[in-house]
């Protein structure tokens, strides 16, 4: 099973995260950031991953450090779980509608980190969660997973729907990109490595 555990402890957060690429959509999440718990739960379900998180952070300040470090840890776990990336499809894309919203996510597990984020958030907050943290989480995820990640929201009015559609599309795109393709011999690159 392609799986990794990451332990991260700083002056701001303490996180233990276990991620399995080949899962059943099961999650056991304690993040201290309820909205991120919700998003990571549906990410796990729609990507058919398994994810366990035990996180404590300085949420009395705000959710920034915990959300950022969750992205770091998930990115590191994805990179470690995929190891040399032999046999994977490498690319994945998904469109996900949620009511009035349509989100698109495209990924390339290229070892070349980049985030292209084209999503306007109508509201600065969903509940107590700062919506600008979605970009922060995704950038740290892309950076640490060494993934090229494009997020495009074609339209949408409800901020919760926009963010939820992004996370579901991310899950489906990563599920596709991490799938082992029996036609792929070795690493999916003409360079012979990623």
Swiss-Prot record:
EC number annotated for this UniProt entry: 4.2.1.19
Keywords: Amino-acid biosynthesis, Cytoplasm, Histidine biosynthesis, Lyase
Biological processes per GO annotation: L-histidine biosynthetic process
Listed GO MF terms: imidazoleglycerol-phosphate dehydratase activity
Coiled-coil regions listed: none
GO CC terms, sorted: cytoplasm
Matches recorded under InterPro entries: IGPD_sf, ImidazoleglycerolP_deHydtase, ImidazoleglycerP_deHydtase_CS, Ribosomal_Su5_D2-typ_SF
Pfam family, one: IGPD
Superkingdom of origin organism: Bacteria
Pathway: Amino-acid biosynthesis; L-histidine biosynthesis; L-histidine from 5-phospho-alpha-D-ribose 1-diphosphate: step 6/9
Keyword Lyase: yes
Location(s), subcellular: Cytoplasm
Amino-acid biosynthesis keyword on record: yes
Catalytic activity annotation: D-erythro-1-(imidazol-4-yl)glycerol 3-phosphate = 3-(imidazol-4-yl)-2-oxopropyl phosphate + H2O
Family statement drawn from the similarity comment of this UniProt entry: Belongs to the imidazoleglycerol-phosphate dehydratase family.
HAMAP family membership: HisB (MF_00076)
PANTHER family (UniProt xref): IMIDAZOLEGLYCEROL-PHOSPHATE DEHYDRATASE (PTHR23133:SF2), IMIDAZOLEGLYCEROL-PHOSPHATE DEHYDRATASE HIS7 (PTHR23133)
Protein name from the UniProt record: Imidazoleglycerol-phosphate dehydratase
Source species of the chain: Halalkalibacterium halodurans (strain ATCC BAA-125 / DSM 18197 / FERM 7344 / JCM 9153 / C-125)
Lineage start: Bacteria, Bacillati, Bacillota, Bacilli, Bacillales
């Amino acid at each position: 099973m392609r799986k990794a555990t990451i332990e991260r402890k700083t002056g701001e957060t303490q996180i233990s995260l276990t991620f399995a690429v080949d899962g059943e959509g099961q999650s056991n999440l304690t993040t201290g950031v309820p909205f991120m718990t919700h998003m990571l739960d549906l990410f796990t379900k729609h990507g058919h991953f398994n994810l366990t998180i035990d996180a404590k952070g300085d949420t009395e300040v705000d959710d920034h450090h915990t959300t950022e470090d969750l992205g770091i840890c998930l990115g590191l776990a994805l990179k470690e779980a995929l190891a040399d990336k032999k046999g994977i499809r490498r690319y994945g894309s998904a469109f996900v509608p949620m009511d009035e919203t349509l989100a698109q996510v495209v990924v390339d597990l290229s070892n070349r980190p980049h985030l292209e984020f084209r999503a306007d958030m109508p509201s600065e907050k969903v509940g107590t969660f700062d919506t600008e943290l979605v970009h922060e989480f995704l950038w740290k995820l892309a950076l640490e997973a060494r993934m090229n990640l494009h997020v495009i929201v074609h339209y949408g009015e409800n901020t919760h729907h926009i963010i939820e559609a992004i996370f579901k599309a991310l899950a489906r795109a990563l599920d596709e990109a991490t799938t082992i393709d029996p036609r792929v011999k070795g690493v999916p690159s003409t360079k012979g490595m990623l």
